[in-house]
């Protein structure tokens, strides 16, 4: 299994998951031309992607999916609520599912789980490679972590986890109180502190890659988020590679497989665009 974060942040999110000849995209929050550019940077064509899963209807996750699906003949999956919240998904005949459903997509089995966010029916995903059993969890856009997540996201090989803001920077930042409340609220975005608390519960010795995602450019910094996470997991068994995804760069590949329990940092790319 290989995972690339094509970009992550308030201006656009997209994550490519590949295993056994199957390629799927989790979100397509960039215009189709930008998606093509980012895919091209890692030698992937849009036509080689079989399907896309939209986690929720907010623009930074869905912006390019309709045009990309038409251009590259993707099958698009989204929760029933997400389709209702973004009617253009109906125009491309997006296939609905209920949060909690498992999608069987070629060599990948993708479990969906409802997230606490202010979308209509938002989801996170766990993709499992049929051949190797490798598991990748992609969790962003959530204001808090439900207790059930510890079970859902255990024994992962790759974890892409939101670490959106530093709480002090959010309070001191440029946003009005209403926006601060939305971002920091129970249905907003996960702070560095809350991300660390969750990671401390679910990381383990076999987790090869921990990737921090959806970092705010105004209320966070990669070095702050990484330091906070390192402190949070310092006394756990985690011995994998920790990194921060970027809004402006393609990051990856993050790899896992039957015998891959330690990441090879030299194999990862950070391609500025």
Where in this protein do the model-derived segments appear?
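Conserved beta-strand hairpin/beta-sheet module of binuclear metal-dependent hydrolase folds
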Residues: 1-42, 122-141, 158
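Structured catalytic core of nucleotide-sugar glycosyltransferases
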Residues: 4-14, 55-65, 69-70, 83-87, ...
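Active-site neighborhood of phospho(di)ester-bond hydrolases with catalytic His/Asp-centered motifs
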Residues: 26-29, 49-57, 77-80, 137-141, ...
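Active-site metal-binding motif and surrounding structural segment of the metallo-beta-lactamase
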Residues: 32-78, 157
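Active-site environment of divalent metal-dependent phosphoester hydrolases
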Residues: 58-62, 83-85, 120, 144-147, ...
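Metallo-beta-lactamase
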Residues: 78-133
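Cap/insert and terminal regions of metallo-dependent hydrolase folds
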Residues: 147-246
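Acidic, low-complexity intrinsically disordered tails
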Residues: 256-273
